[in-house]
Amino acid sequence: MACILKRKPVLVVSFIALCILLLAMRLVNDATFPLLLNCFGQPKTKWIPLPYTFRQPLRTHYGYINVRTQEPLQLNCNHCAIVSNSGQMVGQKVGEEIDHASCIWRMNNAPTKGFEEDVGYMTMVRVVSHTSVPLLLKNPDYFFKEASRTIYVIWGPFRNMRKDGNGIVYNMLKKTVDAYPDAQIYVTTEQQMTHCDRVFKDETGKDRVQSGSYLSTGWFTFILAMDACYSIHVYGMINETYCKTEGYRKVPYHYYEQGKDECNEYLLHEHAPYGGHRFITEKKVFAKWAKKHRIVFTHPNWTLS
């Protein structure tokens, strides 16, 4: 009897230690947890990431300047969810999972209202092309009043973003912050735009301008997210071979509108002699980055060789 009583404290301590170990493993591997589930034959297991708080003081990103205050962006996230605009998101029902991330990133004018079950309803960072700014301004109350806590990062060429009164998009943004003083709108600096072009050339061996292409909003999103996030979970983005896969799922280019077929649009842009986005080429680079950073792609899952 005495031996049994002596063992009880040992068993309790061991049990507590095991629980702490499992929790630590979950925290460390949260970014890759969906893939670990797949390894154990649970590809359909619902994964809800643990809620995070900022893990350290906000980090300053000097390539992004606030339109109203002219101060650089300060942002630092633990677990980021990047939600693709792709029709792949239709019917996925991962909105609750997405909203558990510490920072939820969206692109251009992709809405959440009416699509919450699939894509969630929260947005912390929205990266927007200069060409999509007029689309935001069609519904300014929704984007800049109701979503005043969202950080907007606008990218675009110098001719549209110049601050001397001749930058047509910058002028739109100035008027927007005058009308919505709480709006957090940042623009990408000319130096940061050059940096993004340089990264494209370093990764692909091709000069973006000479190849007649434009970087996508996804490219600018990844550049900032890899600098601001400890781990990244990308939802709804296809890889570079998806459209060549037999029996692939045909979906709209955007989850929020019918019309263009995603794969047709990708192939059209990839081979356009001028003015296209090299979506497929970019996906090859994203796969390369995922091997070096804590990046996971799901819905559909990516296999990184």
UniProtKB/Swiss-Prot annotation:
Catalytic activity annotation: an alpha-Neu5Ac-(2->3)-beta-D-Gal-(1->3)-D-GlcNAc derivative + CMP-N-acetyl-beta-neuraminate = an alpha-Neu5Ac-(2->3)-beta-D-Gal-(1->3)-[alpha-Neu5Ac-(2->6)]-D-GlcNAc derivative + CMP + H(+); a ganglioside GM1b (d18:1(4E)) + CMP-N-acetyl-beta-neuraminate = a ganglioside GD1alpha (d18:1(4E)) + CMP + H(+); a globoside MSGG + CMP-N-acetyl-beta-neuraminate = a globoside DSGG + CMP + H(+); 3-O-[alpha-Neu5Ac-(2->3)-beta-D-Gal-(1->3)-alpha-D-GalNAc]-L-Ser-[protein] + CMP-N-acetyl-beta-neuraminate = a 3-O-{alpha-Neu5Ac-(2->3)-beta-D-Gal-(1->3)-[alpha-Neu5Ac-(2->6)]-alpha-D-GalNAc}-L-seryl-[protein] + CMP + H(+)
Record keywords, A-Z: Disulfide bond, Glycoprotein, Glycosyltransferase, Golgi apparatus, Lipid metabolism, Membrane, Sialic acid, Signal-anchor, Transferase, Transmembrane, Transmembrane helix
Highest taxon, organism lineage: Eukaryota
Disulfide bond entries: C80-C229
Tissue expression profile of the protein: In adult tissues, high expression in brain, lung and heart and to a lesser extent in kidney, mammary gland, spleen, testis and thymus.
EC number: 2.4.3.7
Keyword Phosphoprotein: no
Spans within the Lumenal topological domain: 29-305
Enzyme type, top EC level: transferase
Glycosylation sites noted in the Swiss-Prot or TrEMBL record: N239, N301
Membrane topology, record value: Single-pass type II membrane protein
Biological process according to GO: glycosylceramide metabolic process; protein glycosylation
UniProt-recorded Gene Ontology molecular function terms: alpha-N-acetylneuraminyl-2,3-beta-galactosyl-1,3-N-acetyl-galactosaminide 6-alpha-sialyltransferase activity
Family: Belongs to the glycosyltransferase 29 family.
Protein known as: Alpha-N-acetylgalactosaminide alpha-2,6-sialyltransferase 3
Gene giving rise to this polypeptide: St6galnac3
